[in-house]
Amino acid sequence: MNSGPRFRDALQEIPGYRAGKRPDPRTDGVEAFKVSSNENPYPPLPQVVKVIEQAAHHVNRYPDPGSAELIEAIAAHAGVPREHVAVATGAVALCYQFAQSTAGPGDEVVFAWRSFEAYPIVTSVAGAQPVAVPLLADGHHDMAALAAAVTDRTRLVFICSPNNPTGTVVTQDELDEFMAAVPNDVMVVLDEAYIEFCRDPSAAAGLVTYTKHQNLAVLRTFSKAYGLAGLRVGYAIAQPPVIEALNKTALPFGVSVIAQAAAAASLADDAELRARVDALVAERTRVTQGLRAAGVEVVSSEANFVWLPLGEQTEEFANRSEQAGLTVRAFAGEGVRVTIAETAANDRFIGLASDFSG
């Protein structure tokens, strides 16, 4: 008897992407905060909202499939040729495109773990084998082990810096050594989704380093610092052959009319954006200092979140957080990632974590 459509056997082994949990409805008057998805607490810049309203009048038309104006804006902002830029529906879409354009059955994709949850998913969807390399005990990438994991079957390497969820960075020296050790036919993606929040001068500079390598791409997003998570826009910067491969695997008309206009407008007011990012970085410092003053172990972060390596206490802390009106991101048996959010949310988090550790 026909039981319905037959799907690829490999799908049974692929976990679904698990997004940050939304707060449960409350009836006790306590304001609930979602600090589980690394979202920007600020709304889009005023001029961006205006552009969104204007663009809404044109959604009866297909968007520019080549995102020409947005690509021009990104190229000017980054100081790179337009031929070095590809855009897509969020950085995660580009992760899919990198996997689809480089790897298939019998191939391997290497990445640190724990890191961005999409890496093993996009690898498996492409039919390739994920190779997860454990982080160091301090939450940093083990770059020597990452290089050692590259074999003749490796087609793609993801490096997340600042790393999600630990907030640690790969240094320029580490990246240079890694690129020198990896064959130039292996694609390396430096995922800089949180780079605007980084203040570590030793952190790898993707936009400088990619110019020296045909096989290095830089991945960025408008979801975090720019506060456009709901519009889904990400971009990659790499040499033209890489961009051509990404464009061949892109979803046609993927970036909407509104998303293209809003992202381009977001690049036009650097001063206000920097002020907002600086405010979040200052809050990150305040939160980190408050936690450490209370004896809470917290990893030094260069992103818009902090990581508590709670181990077996993770679930208990997540449950207490939920009860207190804070929905955090828990990774069972490992730790909790908490977004730097509104001041009230940050204050509640400091108090909760302090009480928990005490």
Show where each model-derived region lies.
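N-terminal "arm"/small-domain region of PLP-dependent enzymes with the aminotransferase-like
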Residues: M1-R61
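Phosphate-binding glycine-rich loop
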Residues: P63-E108, A126
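PLP-dependent aminotransferase-like
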Residues: S101-I159
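Short beta-strands and strand-loop turn motifs
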Residues: P130-P134, L156-P162, V188-E192, V299-S301, ...
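Conserved PLP-binding catalytic core of the aspartate aminotransferase-like
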Residues: A137, L280-V281, Q289-A324, I340
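PLP-dependent enzyme catalytic core of the Aspartate aminotransferase-like
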Residues: D173, N319-G358
